């Protein structure tokens, strides 16, 4: 069973709809027992880094998710969910993240021709292979974000060019992140979710 983690973070309905389209058994839950028994976890998210971590802490889910990852359960963070995977965020204030991947989440600097938030379709550039990256080179996916994860190159699988090289997919061990919205990225996005689910079997 894939568990989509419930912490009032926005795009859960779209993620569940995409998984249903793939015929995947999934459930929205904040139940610690279900989370640590899951075959895989998806941490979605739309909103601000500090508020998200505060809500996860309030529900007692930070320790639970860390326990699940330590057990080897695959975790996919989407959009804000990916940003929460790193050590800290600098949105509004400095806030501790999960720390699964070293690095920080910081604001994209607006430049001529590159407004913030970064919103719309961008082509992916695969930097290194992971279980989720097959067939992604040059494919377009949908982004909506103002912050990005600044992490070491060894954890960056896929990037997009947005005045700077923005990490679009990161991973370390059983922890994966997608800065874009696979659930809003058509067949390409569904393919990424399918690869993640296959990884969890």
Swiss-Prot record:
What pathway, per the record?
A: Amino-acid biosynthesis; L-histidine biosynthesis; L-histidine from 5-phospho-alpha-D-ribose 1-diphosphate: step 5/9
Q: Name one GO cellular component term.
A: cytoplasm
Q: Which Gene3D superfamilies does the entry mention?
A: 3.40.50.880
Database matches in Pfam families: GATase (PF00117)
Question: What main location does UniProt list?
Answer: cytoplasm
Known catalytic reactions: 5-[(5-phospho-1-deoxy-D-ribulos-1-ylimino)methylamino]-1-(5-phospho-beta-D-ribosyl)imidazole-4-carboxamide + L-glutamine = D-erythro-1-(imidazol-4-yl)glycerol 3-phosphate + 5-amino-1-(5-phospho-beta-D-ribosyl)imidazole-4-carboxamide + L-glutamate + H(+); L-glutamine + H2O = L-glutamate + NH4(+)
GO terms in the biological process aspect are: L-histidine biosynthetic process
The UniProt record lists the Glutamine amidotransferase type-1 domain at 1-201
Its annotated compartments are: Cytoplasm
Keyword annotations of the record: Amino-acid biosynthesis, Cytoplasm, Glutamine amidotransferase, Histidine biosynthesis, Hydrolase, Lyase
Q: Where is the active site?
A: 79 (nucleophile), 181, 183
Instruction: Quote the EC number.
Output: 4.3.2.10, 3.5.1.2
Molecular function, one GO term: lyase activity
| Domain of life where this protein originates | Bacteria
Functional note: IGPS catalyzes the conversion of PRFAR and glutamine to IGP, AICAR and glutamate. The HisH subunit catalyzes the hydrolysis of glutamine to glutamate and ammonia as part of the synthesis of IGP and AICAR. The resulting ammonia molecule is channeled to the active site of HisF.
State whether it acts alone or in a complex, and with which partners, per the record.
Answer: Heterodimer of HisH and HisF.
Cross-referenced HAMAP family? HisH
Identify this protein by name.
Imidazole glycerol phosphate synthase subunit HisH
Query: Which gene is this protein's source?
Result: hisH
């Amino acid at each position: 069973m894939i568990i989509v983690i419930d912490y009032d973070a926005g795009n859960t309905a779209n993620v569940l709809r995409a998984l249903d389209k793939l015929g995947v058994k999934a459930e929205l839950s904040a139940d610690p027992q279900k989370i640590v028994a899951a075959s895989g976890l998806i941490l979605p998210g739309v909103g601000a880094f500090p508020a998200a971590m505060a809500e996860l802490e309030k529900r007692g889910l930070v320790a639970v998710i860390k326990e699940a990852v330590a057990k080897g359960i695959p975790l996919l963070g989407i959009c804000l969910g990916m940003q929460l995977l790193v050590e800290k965020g600098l949105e509004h204030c400095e806030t501790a993240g999960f720390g699964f991947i070293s690095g920080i989440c910081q604001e994209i600097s607006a430049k001529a021709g590159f407004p913030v938030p970064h919103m719309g379709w961008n082509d992916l550039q695969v930097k290194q292979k992971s279980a989720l990256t097959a067939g992604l080179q040059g494919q377009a996916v949908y982004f909506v974000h103002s912050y990005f994860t600044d992490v070491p190159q060894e954890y960056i699988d896929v990037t997009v060019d947005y005045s700077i090289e923005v990490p679009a997919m990161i991973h370390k061990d059983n922890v994966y992140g997608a800065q874009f919205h696979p659930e809003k990225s058509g067949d390409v996005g569904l393919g990424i979710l399918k690869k993640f689910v296959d990884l969890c079997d």
